Amino acid sequence: MSSDDEINMDDSDSSQGEIDDGCMSDDDGIVLESREQNSSDYKDNGEPDNEVLNHDSLEAEMKKTITDVQAVLQVKTGVCRILLHKYKWNKESLLERFYEHPDTTTFLIDAHVIPRRQERLPAGDAECDICCSLGELSGLSCNHRACTQCWKAYLTNKIANNAQSEIECMAPNCKLLIEDEKVMFYITDPTVIATYRKLIVASYVETNRLLKWCPGIDCGKAVRVSHWEPRLVVCSCGSRFCFSCGHDWHEPVNCRLLKLWLKKCNDDSETSNWINANTKECPKCMITIEKDGGCNHMTCKNTACRFEFCWMCLGPWEPHGSSWYSCNRFDDSAAKNARDAQEVSRANLQRYLFYYNRYMGHQQSLRLEGKLYATVKSKMEQMQTLSMSWIEVQFLRKAVDVLSECRRTLMFTYAFAFYLKRDNNAIIFESNQKDLEMETEQLSGFLERDLDNENLVTLKQKVQDKYRYVEHRRKVLLDHCSEGADQELWVFNE
């Protein structure tokens, strides 16, 4: 194979056919999956407009974008995909930069897609620099060559083990990216080919700011929006998540504070708080000491120190005289500073645990109340046997849906409140939070304990009254949070 095969100018028709047979799907149709969404879930975003795309839909959409750009650039499909990847699949940005160059070759060189100097590879057999075998060598336009088996092994490793879709030349310090047509020429294993196709689609989603993978377990679909912003999106699998950060929908706390909160919950920062609150450092050598008895007369365990001090005031023990079990030394400034720092650590830990326990409490309730769907389903079936239609009994499922949304909102209000500076607006927020929490607990208790105690005549009215009021309280809280954000009323301590 000569280097002429690597010159990136080519007829669009032939290159399109080459990639269609190996790397891309033949299905040009875009399959869109949608699910009905509640406009009340959006804040100042209008009607929901996100679309759900499966793998074939993504691949077809990617092909269409490549074809549109290829018609202008007149380059191979694989080269076009590499360029679009570099520009995060923003074809307007790519074409704008393209028109700033005098010709296609200059543009490709500046984009590091082809080398500045392209040399024809010598014909005939030669020794492979990788495996030292003698035979026909092939390579890229950068003039780096190897035997077919070495290229195959290199590319297979990059795809199967390193999960790469943008693969550089195997030569050290060569940054030339290998186009899809060349990759597909060397790779013959159907499993590796399928993996490569999936990686290409994955890179398409991950570099496109208007696409986001659904975090649902084994979902495999992506959600597309018309414009980027932190917002609720709903996948056809039922997952509801934030388009900005990919986490479960977390209104009212924003993505930045949620990230800080989750890090605080998951890392060892609170272990450090516990150490600060329950241990002290030797005033002399600063080794950490945990008190394991009632006596306040402490001796440092460090054999090189053995300093004796008072646990209460952290001052030297000797001046305490006979005060073996109490400390009356309150005038030492260094000891006072040590005690103050200790109290601050304890207070911070208690404050964190207050919000963390309530956050986790609502999270646990959300999981446990998932069982209510089975209870409600049984009740709905029972009611249908008593002459009520399927539509007439849907109020029970609606009640559980509202309960779940309120639990999720309450859970994240505690992350929001943890960072919120206390002022008049924070007091209003806490009042709304309290009202929502109280009404949510009442709805939960009714659904768990009182369904069977009500006759069918009054049950529907009571359930609807309860979930509508709870839904109203949730809206009041979220509207207040949204207005506060718009008017920049919230002050956070990070």
UniProtKB/Swiss-Prot annotation:
Coiled-coil segments on the chain, per record: none
Region: Disordered, residue numbers: 1-52
Residues binding Zn(2+) 6, per UniProt: 310, 313, 320, 327
Biased composition, class Acidic residues, residue ranges: 1-30
Chain segments carrying region TRIAD supradomain: 124-331
Effect of inactivating the gene: RNAi-mediated knockdown on a pha-1 or on a lin-35;ubc-18 mutant background produces a high percentage of animals with the Pun (pharyngeal unattached) phenotype, whereby the pharynx fails to elongate and form an attachment to the anterior alimentary opening or buccal cavity.
Binding site for Zn(2+) 2: 142, 144, 169, 174
GO biological process: protein ubiquitination; ubiquitin-dependent protein catabolic process
Record's catalysed reaction(s): [E2 ubiquitin-conjugating enzyme]-S-ubiquitinyl-L-cysteine + [acceptor protein]-L-lysine = [E2 ubiquitin-conjugating enzyme]-L-cysteine + [acceptor protein]-N(6)-ubiquitinyl-L-lysine
Protein name listed in UniProt: E3 ubiquitin-protein ligase ari-1.1
Organism: Caenorhabditis elegans
Gene name for this UniProt entry: ari-1.1
